[in-house]
Amino acid sequence: MRIFSFCFLFIILTLSLFFISKVRAGEGASSNYFPGTYGDYAVAVPPNPGLTYINYNLFYSGDVDQAVLQGRVETDIDTFVYVNMSALIYTFENSIFGGSFATAAFIPISYVDLEADLIGELASSRVNDSETGLGDLILMPFSGYWNTGNFYFNLYELITIPTGEYDIENNVNLGHNYWSFDTVLAITYFNLESGREFSFVPGFMINTENKDTDYRTGSQFHLDAMFNQFFSENFAMGLHGYYFKQVTGDSGSGAVLGDFKGESIGIGPSLLWTPKVGKWYPTITANWLHDLDATNQLKGDYVVLTLVWQIGKIGK
């Protein structure tokens, strides 16, 4: 069914959004986790073999009372982020350990606008700056899929590479200047007869130190959950939510606000549409996620518009 062919891809698509985020606790009240983007529709259902191209547009607007940015304390922070992402995912045809296997790479082009009060030694000043360019790349070296009956499981590892521009003298940076390693398990229950689907996606992220600022963001637990109803193979609606908690404090001489642990929760609606375009069935989704509560991090709204185009087997 086309539900299987396309919907499962959104776990890979949406998890890719996390690494360009400027919106979690830690240095800059930010993290390489992007809330609510580790799942969409039938997130753990295995993909068809072959190549898939993904393009999406991400919009985020939020604010936070204070944070450490580029080694400086800033207050009354407002930010807007737009990202256009291109990604290629390849799913292997041969079974591995009784399941299917995929690998992927993601390239973001980002725009970030920041307004904040910069706290100096003698006085404070209001800054307003923006930047456009390449963000931090992400690799997914492995993603394994297994299923039994109506239950599906997806285990994968995400590696964020600090390729985005970073300069401690800048007011705005497109990269975080540290590596992140995120281990994630997605679990889906999908009843094809009723079209009803539940998914849960817990993950645990470990971050390295930003050596330019001597700031290490603490380890983070995140959980995404979604309930979806398919009305046909071409249309579905869902209610999605997330929970985020930083489990170890920030550290290093640059962590002048202490451990700065963050915690947040959010919820919002989602739509999926799979039109027929010639012989192709591209999938389009629209998601809105609103932060209900946030501590030590930006609080705001996320809108994500995505397009998934399954190319298929190479040479076929």
Regions found by a protein language model. Give the residues of each.
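Outer-membrane pore/translocation modules
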Residues: 108-217, 258-260, 312
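Short loop/turn motifs that connect adjacent beta-strands in outer-membrane beta-barrel proteins
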Residues: 26-28, 42-50, 93-102, 146-153, ...
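Residues that define the transmembrane beta-barrel architecture of outer-membrane proteins
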Residues: 78-86, 128-138, 175-181, 215-221, ...
